[in-house]
Amino acid sequence: MFEVNPVKFKIKELAERTQLLRGIFDYDAKNERLEEVTRELESSEVWNDPERAQALGKERASLEAVVKTIDDMDSGLEDVEGLLELAIEEEDEDTFNETSKELDYLESRLADLEFRRMFSGPQDASNCYLDIQSGSGGTEAQDWANMVLRMYLRWGEAHGFSPELMEVTDGDVAGIKGATIKFTGEYAFGWLRTETGVHRLVRKSPFDSSGRRHTSFCSVFVYPEIDDDITIDINPSDLRIDTYRASGAGGQHVNKTESAIRITHLPTNTVVQCQNDRSQHKNKDAAMKQLKAKLFELEMLKQNADKQAAEDAKSDIGWGSQIRSYVLDDARIKDLRTGVETRNTQAVLDGDLDKFIEASLKSGL
């Protein structure tokens, strides 16, 4: 005979968690808004304004993620109760096992929704940019920056964030000096915002004929793409705009043209670059959008008492602002903020970062 009480307890627990989320996410208001948005999108007039239609489509997807999950939980738990009753009546172990599997599936759906609670920041739902900058250390540090670039590109691809390499600057011998990736998708910034900081590598350098261990640093800075309705005043006289020939590592990512743009905001010494289009005009527009996003995030950081260190992390590549240590010889990667670590170093370098990201988000970093 199978154990019924644990299953009944889990059904009750999931129902209570669902009810709690119903209040936290303001289900009734979201459901009402979803109906309004759906009606508007079904109107032919909305397509006269493609930007408005796109924004509504994005809002509908966000609303559906909450409303549909809660609806599915309600109906799913009701179905599971029916299955359990049937299993008990007929003493059918196969039906009971099916009940347990369905409960596990519903719990995973609920856990996903609970995880979304951590994306409560005003910009968390936005697309984002991720800057990578190699630290001092020459070729070894530049190779490490390239490994970090590959790691985040793999992570973005695995999560459907359509990573786009906006700019990459080759290293002197190997690797890269710096790069910028754009991640497009719901909660891209929410997922990546705690990755800002310094990433430290310890390994036997392939560039050292003596095979000595080297320590290298690479900084990461994440900032959200901002909506057009947020006004950022930039004085044109504060900008220095340079054009150059794109020469990115791994030419499959970047067009090798004369149209690359570098914009420097002189008062803050903030630099953005774009070289992913053959059109200089399009690259300039993309770089200006990126500059506004970066200046906006820097201003937000300044307004928070504990954010000065995060701003410093953009340029201070050293011991003080480390967030994660990658010790390859010992097969150990450890997050210095949460204590989470793994020995599967290759999986992490191939983009398996969720264990670290989820722990940092859950700890409220």
Curated annotation (Swiss-Prot):
Compartmental location: Cytoplasm
Pfam families: PCRF (PF03462), RF-1 (PF00472)
GO molecular function annotation: translation release factor activity, codon specific
Main location: cytoplasm
Residues recorded with modification N5-methylglutamine: 252
Keywords: Cytoplasm, Methylation, Protein biosynthesis
Post-translational changes noted in the entry: Methylated by PrmC. Methylation increases the termination efficiency of RF2.
One of the record's GO cellular component terms: cytoplasm
Annotated function: Peptide chain release factor 2 directs the termination of translation in response to the peptide chain termination codons UGA and UAA.
Family recorded in the similarity comment: Belongs to the prokaryotic/mitochondrial release factor family.
Descriptive protein name: Peptide chain release factor 2
Biological source species: Shewanella baltica (strain OS223)
Source taxonomy: Bacteria, Pseudomonadati, Pseudomonadota, Gammaproteobacteria, Alteromonadales
